[in-house]
Amino acid sequence: MSTEAFENFFFDVCTFDYSKFNPGMQNLQTRMQNADKIHIKGDDTDLRFSIKDIGAVACGGTHNIPDGEVFSCPIKDSVHGHIQFNAPTIYRGTDFDGIRLEFKDGKIVDAIANSDASTEALNEILDSDGGARYIGEFAIGFNPYVVQPMRDILFDEKIGGSFHFTPGQCYDDASNGNDSQVHWDMVKIQRPDYGGGEIYFDDELIRKDGEFVVNDLIPLNPDQLLK
């Protein structure tokens, strides 16, 4: 991205009218607060977990700019399945790409990246302490101006059509009790140009290929937010 392109992008995300996230964002928060079983499907991804009674927090520009996510957290031992992330990430100064995690009873039991060196570094981080192999956050991103990963998590976790799944420390206001020095937001984009994917709440399809498909959440889709 050129300097001029970044300037335009930065001004767009900073001057966006964040009040447009309401009421769709509040509806998503309510759905997450009331949900039990989450099922996420996509390219080399099939995850199941529960967020029952964990709570959910809406982030609509009050504390961060850019913003645009609602987060919760899986019950610690409820995560099963696997996920292939498709957004690059930097953690502790190291660049990672192609991270794939496999879960059993909430714990990451297999973790690889796109090279032997990256896989070794990834597992060193996940072995930092007893909580680093458990998930501390699940969040859905919907900022219409943030569309491509740029290796800056303040931006990348808000990518429209994405979600992130976070090994390590949970937040107090959506807590599953997991404690760790690690909090590593890993992003998967589910738009068609990134392989698509689906998110289900209690067997109801909520989002398909990055677009919300239930009436009360459609206001969070880019074509609605950018009107």
Question: Language model features by range: what are they?
Answer:
Residues 182-227:
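Extended hydrophobic packing segments that form well-structured cores
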Residues 1-80, 215-216, 220-222, 226-227:
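Active-site bordering "gate/hinge" segments
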Residues 80, 96-98, 105, 133-137, ...:
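Active-site lining segments that contact anionic ligands and/or coordinate catalytic metals
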